[in-house]
């Protein structure tokens, strides 16, 4: 089915991004014979439209930067793929799909080094600027702790539309595969993420960010929990 024929309210919702569509169709091609691929893709498209039929209409559509590549609506598209193709896909495949959407931007920033005060302060300012967008749409409710020299950056989300969506539709089992990219993205900035909880299984997503050489990391070793979340002690 052509994207333009997909029925959902385009005044308040957005279509999945083209990179996301490419990822999903590539995975479908891995798992299904050629004669079935268009049918499976159409099932994913219809699932996406069905999910949007009773979804929040206040997330800003194209105006909200969280709805771009790898963002809220791409997560819904990936969950649509997971719903249709659960029998053939895997946790790692879903994790890889989100990485392929998010990480290219961070790879372009490989010159950033969070170990250096200059870059750490710029990273902090980027998070502070993001608050205005969150406050405008009230999608990801965000707060950032005051900056302290030689201490990790800290911010948190107390609401997350992707987590809210997954909880509503019984898809929390795949959320770790979508959330773990936060760790991989920080690693590309010579940084590390320290996290203890998420909006999926707690009241917030916490982000403590420090340079990859920071002694703070020794106090908070990383592990994977039973659900597949990357976490820290």
Where are these regions (language model features)?
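N-terminal, charged low-complexity regulatory/assembly segments
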Residues: 1-85
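A short, structure-level motif marking secondary-structure boundaries and short turns
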Residues: 65-67, 166-169, 224
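Amphipathic interaction/junction segments at domain boundaries or subunit interfaces
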Residues: 73-168
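Short, hydrophobic/π-rich interface segment
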Residues: 141-201
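Short, charged/polar, Gly/Pro-enriched secondary-structure boundary elements
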Residues: 162-164, 212-219
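Short, cationic low-complexity segments
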Residues: 184, 222-233
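C-terminal edge-of-domain segments
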Residues: 196, 202-212
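N-terminal functional module detector in eukaryotic proteins
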Residues: 206-208, 219, 225
């Amino acid at each position: 089915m052509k994207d333009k024929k997909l029925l959902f309210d385009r005044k308040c919702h957005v279509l999945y991004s083209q990179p996301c569509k490419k990822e999903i169709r590539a995975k479908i091609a891995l798992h299904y014979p050629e004669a079935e691929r268009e049918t499976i893709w159409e099932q994913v498209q219809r699932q996406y439209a069905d999910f949007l039929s009773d979804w929040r209409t206040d997330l800003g559509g194209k105006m909200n930067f969280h709805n771009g590549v790898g963002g809220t609506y791409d997560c819904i598209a990936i969950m649509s793929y997971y719903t249709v193709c659960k029998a053939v896909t895997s946790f790692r495949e879903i994790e890889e799909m989100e990485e392929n959407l998010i990480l290219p931007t961070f790879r372009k920033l490989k010159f950033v080094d969070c170990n250096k005060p200059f870059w750490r302060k710029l990273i902090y300012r980027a998070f502070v600027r993001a608050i205005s967008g969150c406050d405008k749409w009230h999608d990801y409710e965000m707060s950032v702790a005051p900056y302290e020299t030689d201490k990790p950056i800290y911010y948190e989300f107390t609401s997350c539309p992707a987590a809210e969506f997954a909880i509503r539709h019984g898809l929390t089992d795949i959320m770790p595969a979508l959330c773990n990219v936060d760790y991989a993205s920080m690693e590309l900035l010579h940084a590390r993420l320290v996290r203890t909880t998420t909006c999926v299984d707690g009241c917030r997503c916490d982000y403590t960010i420090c340079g990859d050489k920071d002694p703070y990391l020794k106090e908070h070793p990383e592990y994977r929990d039973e659900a597949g979340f990357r976490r820290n002690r």
